[in-house]
Amino acid sequence: MKRKLLLFVLCLPLFGLAQKEGNIWYFGENAGLDFNNGSPVALTDGMLNTSEGCASICDANGNLLFYTDGMLVYNKNHGIMPNGTGLLGHSSSTQSAIIVKKPMSNNLYYIFTVDDIFNTNGGAVTYSIVDMSLDGGLGGVTVDKNILLFNDASEKITAIKHQNEVDFWIVAPQHTTNTYYSYLLTSVGLSSAPVLNNVGSIPSNAGYLKASPDGTKIIAANT
């Protein structure tokens, strides 16, 4: 759902990134920010053209790896990755994509996408896997692409570091009930069966989901 409120900070990966993995942001209409030298430096070389959700990821030294609007995946040279088109996020989904590195892996990253709730599947949550060893180290989307987790999600999703400091919980609410779906991502892969929790009132269709730094609380901002 399109909103006339620019909350670009919330377009980006919404979990505690270690080291410098969140130091470069791409968002909006060809906009970006580089935080590697302390003060932010504006970037104008990005390829995104989106009013809402987007995500970027760097390596541990703050070097850009790739970024996405949930539909197209761009490598560090701003070219579309092999198999990097047709992901099932949406330019009018508030949290169209988040990126999570697979625990204990050097090359594999999960892109979790959320569709616009007004599309056919009503905000389907899907994931695709990027392998950074492909295309000469620039990365590519693997055959594990647009794997459905569940339908009827609101346009909210977040990732929370597990208490073991290695794994992640991927959390997203439905928009028709107060049910939150939580999937565990480990070095083995993503759990197929979610943990379901009914919490509070039914969330609004759009908005943002954010975890506290210690991972003990989440907040849903409705729009």
Which residues make up each language-model segment?
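Structural signature of eukaryotic scaffold interfaces centered on beta-propeller domains
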Residues: 19, 49-61, 88-107, 149-167, ...
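Short acidic-glycine loop/turn motifs at beta-strand connectors
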Residues: 12, 59-62, 176, 185-187
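Predominantly a core beta-strand signature of beta-propeller blades
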Residues: 40, 142-146, 190-196
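Bacterial Sec-dependent N-terminal signal peptides
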Residues: 1-23
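Structural core positions within WD40/WD-like beta-propeller blades
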Residues: 26, 65-66, 110-112, 169-171, ...
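Asp-box/WD-like beta-propeller blade repeats and closely related beta-sheet repeat scaffolds
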Residues: 120-169, 173-174, 198-199
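Beta-propeller domains
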Residues: 20-94, 101-104, 114-140, 165-223
